[in-house]
UniProtKB/Swiss-Prot annotation:
Induction: Transcriptionally regulated by SCO4008. It is found in: Cell membrane. One of its GO terms (cellular component) is plasma membrane. It comes from Streptomyces coelicolor (strain ATCC BAA-471 / A3(2) / M145). This is Probable transporter SCO4007.
Length: 430
């Protein structure tokens, strides 16, 4: 594993499906100054779409004549849709015009969100959420672009700025979504999200650099290349598995939190009050720039180890938080700090370990969201059968799996270091 992502030399691969012309025209003037802030804002809005349903579950259940725990699977549908969109659309960032792709996906997501707002049943709502989430892959098309354009010694910090936008969107979905849902109804929240997605998605597409690309090979060559790319890169594989464990633990806890906070057996809060709890997620937005600096300085491995230690500490605090609000608040801060630090480190590594950053980023994010979707799917039944303690058990199991599974395949740098020490020992013996 590279000691610092900013100094990594991408390994050669045969993945790229397009030849990039060097004459691409980038943003200039005011557009250049707005480039990173607008991308971060667009990332926040589009990321929020994936999590809109979670804080609105009690309102959706009431409107559909059901219970919150019975419709909790909608949160998993959103994450599965996002993972599917990543598989099919994110690899296209290496082979097609990103301006057109961002604009098209933004319009598809807008239409799906409006359809969700008009849904008469959970089946139709789930279908609309699935499509909206699949089209909400714009952030993962933009992160590789930001990494490409950033100076080498500030790459992780620029990536961290976009990730800070992503987690701000997650917080906004819970806080503002809960408040707006309580005031205007859950359907109005989806309409508002559709408007913001259209405006910011098209604005972001407008300021993206003009790219002249000549595609070679099938359109979805990047998708086909993912398994081989992960197999050839131990560093990428390690980042994928560890983030799947971390994101799965966070997802199990965070998507089930509304059930603990709003149901009578828990804290019995209103949807609006429970949504305010999402403000603790702002810890992620604060930690992201700090984590970027730490990755640039100390390398990804140390940051990921520290993040896993924080997450492991948060799980017993979450369990205690089933009865003690102070413990729940502390755990929420810790798990968000752990998630974003791990994400910045692992994603920077994924973007710099191969010569096909969009495809590598797809593999990384799909792994994370697949882990999150599966953990969320298990957390709902766990809450129904064993209460909040069952959810905490799912989160703990995901952390253990994410860490121990990577121990059987050391990273490239670790193997290289051991080989170098062996060579030096032999030479000194001679």
């Amino acid at each position: 594993m590279p000691s610092s992502p900013s100094s990594t030399t991408p390994a050669p691969t045969s993945t790229p499906a397009a030849r990039r012309e060097p004459s691409g025209k980038g943003p200039s003037g005011a557009a250049a100054r707005l480039f990173l802030p607008l991308i971060a804002l667009c990332t926040a809005v589009t990321a929020a779409n994936i999590y809109l349903a979670a804080p609105l579950l009690p309102l959706i259940a009431h409107d559909m004549g059901s219970t919150p725990s019975a419709v909790a699977w909608l949160a998993s549908v959103a994450q599965l849709g996002y993972a599917a969109g990543l598989l099919f659309f994110a690899p296209l960032g290496d082979s097609v015009n990103r301006r057109r792709l961002v604009a098209a996906l933004s319009l598809v997501a807008t239409a799906a969100l409006l359809t969700a707002a008009a849904s008469a049943g959970t089946g139709a709502l789930a279908g609309a959420v699935l499509v909206a989430s699949a089209a909400t892959v714009v952030p993962q098309l933009l992160v590789p672009l930001v990494a490409e354009r950033a100076p080498a010694d500030r790459r992780a910090r620029h990536v961290a700025a976009v990730i800070a936008g992503l987690f701000t969107g997650v917080v906004a979905a819970r806080v503002l979504g809960g408040l707006a849902g309580q005031a205007f109804g859950w359907r109005a929240v989806f309409v508002g999200a559709a408007v913001l997605t259209a405006v910011l998605g098209l604005a972001t597409a407008y300021i993206l650099p003009v790219e002249r690309r000549q595609r070679r090979g099938p359109l979805f060559a990047g998708l086909v290349a993912i398994p081989g790319l992960v197999r050839r890169s131990p560093d990428l594989w390690r980042a994928c598995v560890r983030q799947a464990g971390m994101y799965g633990a966070w997802s199990a806890l965070w998507t089930s939190l509304a059930l603990l906070l709003t149901e009578g057996e828990g804290y019995g809060m209103t949807t609006a009050a429970a949504g305010l709890f999402g403000l603790f997620g702002l810890a992620a937005s604060v930690v992201a720039p700090l984590a970027g600096g730490l990755v640039d300085r100390f390398g990804a491995a140390k940051v990921v180890r520290s993040a896993y230690a924080l997450a492991a500490l948060s799980v017993p605090l979450f369990w205690l938080g089933g009865q003690v609000m102070a413990a729940l608040c502390a755990a929420a801060v810790l798990v968000h700090a752990a998630l974003v630090a791990s994400h910045v480190a692992n994603q920077t590594l994924a973007l710099t370990t191969t010569s096909a950053p969009a495809t590598a980023n797809t593999a990384y994010v799909v792994a994370g969201f697949a882990g999150g979707a599966l953990a969320s799917a298990l957390a709902g039944p766990a809450f129904g059968h064993w209460g909040w303690g069952g959810v905490c058990a799912v989160a703990g199991a995901w952390l253990v799996l994410g860490w121990t599974a990577t121990a059987v395949r050391p990273a490239r740098s670790a193997r290289s270091a051991r080989s170098a020490r062996s060579v030096r020992s032999v030479r000194s013996a001679r």
